[in-house]
């Protein structure tokens, strides 16, 4: 019973320290912009897994990769802190 409680407690804390969002490009001309895609879930899934996310997919309406269960330290795009200057 104690082991089951410990597993559930651990799963809870892991879930608390994860987030979902659009990963951003960290260097170059497009720094601060979302990672773009055009209906290519495999590309986005690979990008998200490299960032230690659980899965990723191409969000068609935004033409950008969306990642689920990213660690908190991975920067994600936010409208409030948008620094993308790509044209």
UniProtKB/Swiss-Prot annotation:
SUPFAM superfamilies named in the record: Scorpion toxin-like
Localization, UniProt: Secreted
Any one GO cellular component localisation term in the record: extracellular region
UniProt keyword annotation of Disulfide bond present: yes
GO biological process: defense response
Main subcellular localisation: secreted
This protein's domain notes: Has the structural arrangement of an alpha-helix connected to antiparallel beta-sheets by disulfide bonds (CS-alpha/beta).
Designated name of the protein: Neurotoxin LmNaTx64.1
């Amino acid at each position: 019973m104690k082991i089951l409680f410990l597993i559930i407690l651990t799963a809870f804390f892991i879930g608390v320290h994860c987030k979902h969002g659009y990963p951003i490009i960290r260097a170059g001309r497009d720094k601060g912009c979302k990672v773009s895609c055009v209906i290519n879930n495999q590309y986005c899934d690979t990008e998200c897994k490299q960032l230690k996310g659980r899965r990723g997919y191409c969000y068609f309406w935004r033409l950008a990769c969306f990642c689920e269960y990213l660690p908190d330290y991975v920067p994600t795009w936010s409208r409030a802190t948008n620094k993308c200057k790509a044209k």
